[in-house]
């Protein structure tokens, strides 16, 4: 019997919109997690039967969910089951808890003199987050129990902080079912250390940890995030924690809580190099490569590609570029900063304000340094994937300076796509620093002067060294492709 794999995530591999004629038009989902899971599933698909469970995010998605009648649409050959969660429940769970509380927590983003304020409104929102996770747990249990029986081999892969309660809730629904149903949870974010984690209300913080420990395996991109999770389990829950796992080399610890053993593992996500390079040869990307080359006019290019996300640290990156032009005037007229950003989470007030600050600061830098024959900075805030690939291809320097990041795929994709070798200026607070740090220029993301100095060092780096470093970075990114990343998650459930 083929292995059955159930994937659960907030955003799925396909989303729908209504066309002009009222028809439903599907579009492949974006984002690093989605791309990684799709690519990984493609590699294991011949040996597995997969169903992907996700939330309906739009009115069109909800129409599809109702039309499905518990069936599934398909994307990339994967059956997709969308959950029609009430819009107000979804909004509170996604925007008020997942993004405004848990995301801020793990990225250490709270403005603590003012926020957060966990009052009655948050308690209402938390009940919605619980209901949202219950909807996923119920759907996963339905799918799993439909297969339960002799010979059934079912693996559940729960993705990210939106679904931190789902593993425990699923366990409750599987009580008495086949012991061949095993559950994994993977966090694509960092994890907060215990002292910061205690910002959450005590019962909420314990519920999140307890929920994740309903899984047989809990995974992270970097060992430091796994270590912080173990610290929280020990400090907040009083769970029994060991730092040497009983599994494979990717196991960094285990937690015994409520009679269950959970392995804590590390699986860094790299890049599907053949697919990425093939996409970069498409006509739309090549057109952008030519256009960016004309815009550069022979000047050096410092490139960044981000979402307008608070943790991506775009404002300090712009400040570092301004300091470079101020302290190293020899670069005026000889370098251009391409800052390409994707709009992100406009429903969250802090994100709207941050995007406006990015736009304003870019305007100030342009006005301060512009010359008749030179525009020092090109900022575009819109979704344009081909343009982003092209920017990575032509970069002399790639700036990736998040204040905190679970992994960061751009830091890996840039060297893979580079056509002339690029120097990588990388935050030490990105999970990717653990694998790329030897060949990148590591910086403190809060230190604008250090970042400016690293940009200068990258610009003057000898071509041979730049190419050597870029090739080494690309090789590292290729060493953990999505197929291996997802396969390792499945393997961790067999121990």
Residue ranges and their predicted role:
Residues 1-495:
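Catalytic cores of carbohydrate-active enzymes across secretory and cytosolic contexts
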